[in-house]
Amino acid sequence: MEEKMDSKRIENAFFEVIEALGDVEYKEELKDTPKRIADSYKEIFYGIDIDPKEVLTKTFEVNSNELIMEKNMDFYSMCEHHFLPFFGTVCIAYVPNKKIFGFGDILKLIEILSRRPQLQERLTEEIAKYIYEILNCQGVYVVVEAKHLCVTMRGQKKENTKILTTSAKGVFETDSNKKLEVLTLLK
């Protein structure tokens, strides 16, 4: 895959940010920081150019329509509003329709979608959308709980605040018992 990220441009931009901060006492120690930031952005944002549909091509046939849940999957991302990290856990429950992903593939989906400038609400919706569309499952319910450093470090500065977002597709939109089953298992 061709790398589209312009590391040199990122490096130059962060050099300008450091200069714009004013007379920073430790300028000598900061001289390699722009390059380190550019290098770290390659890793942090590697999901930008990856289409999840191209990666999630392997499914397994099943003869079950029972709930499948994978929970407490850690992730981190960067808030697109402030370019500060947010991190937390994802829980995914779905009812298959003859095919499933391997558990590692679900982790891969979360990784790809979170490794880009992101909003938690969009991340939650995208995870649900891709699982629902690719698997053509009966329904999917996604819960994302995260701590945002933009809330902790700036503005209101509330250290213990966590944001919870959900997305429901298919049977989870219409069958309150199915949704209740997931919420009970989350406790």
Curated annotation (Swiss-Prot):
It catalyses: GTP + H2O = 7,8-dihydroneopterin 3'-triphosphate + formate + H(+). InterPro entries: GTP-CH-I_C/QueF, GTP-CH-I_N, GTP_CycHdrlase_I, GTP_CycHdrlase_I_CS, GTP_CycHdrlase_I_dom. Transmembrane segments: none annotated. The keyword Transport does not apply. The keyword GTP-binding applies. One of its GO terms (molecular function) is zinc ion binding. Zn(2+) binds at residues 79, 82, 150. GO terms for cellular component: cytoplasm. Toroid-shaped homodecamer, composed of two pentamers of five dimers. Belongs to the GTP cyclohydrolase I family. This is GTP cyclohydrolase 1. Its EC number is 3.5.4.16. It holds the Pfam family GTP_cyclohydroI. Keywords: GTP-binding, Hydrolase, Metal-binding, Nucleotide-binding, One-carbon metabolism, Zinc.
